[in-house]
Design a protein with these regions (language model features):
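Short amphipathic alpha-helical interface segments
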Residues: 84-112
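Small-residue-rich helix-interface/hinge motifs
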Residues: 6, 10-86, 116, 120-190, ...
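Conserved PDZ fold ligand-binding element
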Residues: 103, 109-110, 120, 251-274
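Terminal peptide-recognition signature
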Residues: 25-28, 66, 251, 259-262, ...
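Functional transmembrane alpha-helices
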Residues: 2-5, 174-207, 231, 235-246, ...
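Pore domain of cation channels
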Residues: 209-220, 382-396, 402
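Short, flexible surface segments
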Residues: 60, 71, 258-261, 285
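Internal alpha-helical transmembrane segments
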Residues: 12-24, 30-51, 60, 178-244, ...
Length: 453
């Protein structure tokens, strides 16, 4: 029973920490997309699932909610997939001519195959340009695209609810209404594309990709600053008073206890912890080291034998100090730099395996999260801050589908002056996913050997 509770505790704290941090990461992408005028159809805590609790924002049209698969979160930013369909403009125009129409009817009218029409509808659905149409009693079929589509509410300028403040709700059509395009089919499709990720320039695309990473780093930074300023940090006190004695240690066997003040070691007077440390180091290797100490105002003495490779088992006294904001910020920033250096070492072949052996998958993070939670809120939040840093910088690795991999593709396209062929991007993504999977399996194996077996 104890083992089961331990596992459940690890799973709970691990999922809680990762879900919140990934949700915040996706929140960065969401906010950046909205700031760039890009449509976002969904923003959820948890992975996509047919079962969810949600609320659709009347102001921006985005569906906010939570799913049972609490393994992170996601923001459905329109136009993230590098897909293009040559006849999407015709399909879009036809849907707005009819208001509501089936894929089969569109295929007949446009003299296209149903597969071609469905491909175009999937693209337009992902752009937030159309909506699925379900008649009374019908429900979405998991794993399948809808076969009937309808128009979205549009104002005179062509804006939809996904366009936020620019949408004139008072003078807009209703969902499923026929609406006349204000321009040609190709131009209207180009307008719709301008509200997607693909329709933005390099700077805005890079900003949207980096926003999640920035939020993770900022989250970790603020967490550490808060902990250092409010809860404080434990620092050593340079005094001869013992902070802790290891149970079963040489010092414990000699009768030395927590709170005893070491007066001398092997005849060397001690008034600070550095005096104690130096005296023990010099006396190591002797069989009759005399230690004089004070407890409750009374002096005591004892003798210990300490080999050169043995430890006495005493620790320095500590105290909790609340740091000022500047010192807290400086110390927090040092952790940011350390994490960044660690991730950079992962890219250096001579250090790759060393870093991977020290890294953890979700299993290791869950176990350590449970241990941190048991140690107290400050320890748990400190660990969460370090994981947030790691999550942010790991996403910078140039491996698709990570943000860093996508950014590399954007840089290549900027230098080349054109978009990479869809086939090339697809191949690169598959290779990246395979590499990412191998890294995960390796770290999972290490965690199982480290924490379970």
């Amino acid at each position: 029973m104890e083992t089961v509770l331990s596992v459940l505790s690890s799973v709970f704290w691990g999922l809680l920490m990762l879900s919140v941090l990934v949700f915040l990461h996706e929140g960065g992408h969401f906010l950046a997309a909205r700031a760039c005028g890009v449509r976002v159809t969904e923003f959820f805590l948890g992975l996509p699932c047919r079962f969810d609790i949600h609320h659709t924002s009347r102001r921006i049209g985005t569906k906010f909610g939570v799913t049972p698969l609490l393994l992170g979160g996601y923001a459905a930013i329109c136009g993230m997939d590098p897909t293009d369909v040559s006849y999407a403009d015709r399909v879009l125009a036809a849907i707005y001519r009819h208001g509501r129409v089936t894929v089969a009817d569109l295929a007949v009218e446009l003299e296209l195959s149903e597969e071609d029409v469905l491909e175009a509808c999937a693209l337009l659905l992902g752009w937030g340009s159309i909506a699925p149409w379900y008649e009374e009693g019908e429900k979405p079929s998991p794993g399948y695209y809808p076969t009937k589509y309808q128009t979205l509410p549009r104002d005179a300028a062509g804006y939809t609810t996904f366009d936020g403040r620019r949408f004139d709700r008072e003078h807009a059509t209703a969902e499923g209404d026929v609406w006349e395009l204000p321009c040609g089919e190709a131009e209207f499709l180009a307008r719709e594309r301008s509200h997607t990720y693909l329709g933005q320039g390099f700077v805005k695309r890079a900003f949207m990709l980096l926003a999640g990473i920035i939020v993770n780093i900022l989250t970790g930074f603020l967490l550490l600053m808060s902990i250092y300023s409010i809860a404080g940090v434990t620092v050593p006190v340079d005094t001869n008073v013992i902070g802790q004695v290891d149970e079963g240690s040489i010092a414990s066997a000699a009768g030395i206890e927590d709170g005893d003040a070491i007066l001398s070691v092997d005849g060397v007077s001690c008034s600070t912890w550095m005096d104690v440390y130096d005296a023990i180091g010099k006396a190591a290797g002797k069989d009759d080291i005399a230690i004089e100490y004070e407890r409750d105002g009374k002096k005591h003495s004892t003798t210990v034998a300490l080999k050169e490779d043995e430890r006495l088992g005493v620790y320095v006294s500590t105290q909790v100090v609340r740091l000022d904001p500047i010192t807290s910020a400086r110390l927090s920033f040092s952790y940011v730099v350390q994490t960044a250096k660690g991730v950079m070492r992962l890219l250096q072949p001579q250090h790759t395996m060393e870093i991977l052996d020290k890294s953890s998958s979700i299993v290791g993070i869950s176990v350590m999260s449970s241990q941190a939670a048991a140690a107290g809120p400050a320890t748990f939040l400190s660990f969460a801050a370090l994981i947030s840093f790691s999550l942010g910088f790991m996403n910078l690795l140039p491996i698709p589908p990570l943000d860093g991999g996508k950014l590399v593709i954007e840089i290549i396209q900027k230098i080349a002056g054109r978009e990479l062929p869809l086939k090339v991007q697809t191949i690169v993504s598959y290779v990246g996913i395979a590499l990412f999977a191998l890294l995960f399996i390796y770290m999972l194996r290490s965690d199982i050997l480290r924490f379970i077996l």
